[in-house]
Amino acid sequence: MYFAIIGDIINSRNINTDSTLQIRNEVQINLSKILEEINIKYADVIAANFLITLGDEFQGLLNHPKYVFEIIETIKLNIYPIKLRFGIGIGSIYTKINRDMAIGADGPAYYNARKMVEQIKVLEKGKMNGSVNIMIKEEVELHPHEINLMNSNLQLCSSIENNWTWKQREIIKEIMLEKKSQVEAAETLGISQSSVQRRLKAAGFYDYIQGVETISTIVSQIWG
């Protein structure tokens, strides 16, 4: 069982014009750096390294679900203000896996991840515009209720995240990625601990993190 992650830049056409060529290059350089760091940090669970497959898309393959959402959060928080949509595909891989060439792997895990990216694009054109940025699909639908529950929960988490301000994101990045306490985050950012607490509460951070951790636990219990 494998866990494919496909990420896609939202509104990538807006950074594909000649006037924004420099911005596009900077985005690709930054994204490449983030993915390289992920490949090193999470090497134990990576079956095929994360890499950019198209100018506005990247993918990677995991052999264990433990860090699926931690990896996604790392990418999202580090690439902001560029926004991304993610498809998570759970399933088998038919081809031989080359760790350094994820683009050559093929199978239901990637098909499902791709389907979810496309599904998010469809939802963005309707009433769900902006409120969904991650969806999950499994190869054989043995857990339809759990999948629906997780996707609904991810939708709620996305709605919370979309309202975060720059200052709130700064703190959340310190807490989630750097694993700092509120006191440590306050020292890093040069603010008081009470300010950190207020911003986290205003951001709905505790509801968000509980939702993400619940989904991560369910995924690990079923497929871990």
Q: What is each PLM-predicted segment?
A:
Residues 181-189, 196:
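Short alpha-helical "recognition helix" segments of helix-turn-helix
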Residues 204-220:
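Short, Lys/Arg-enriched C-terminal cap helix and immediately downstream tail that follows
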Residues 1-125:
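DNA-contacting interfaces and partner/effector-binding or oligomerization modules
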Residues 168-175:
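Short alpha-helical "packing" element that flanks the helix-turn-helix/winged-helix DNA-binding module
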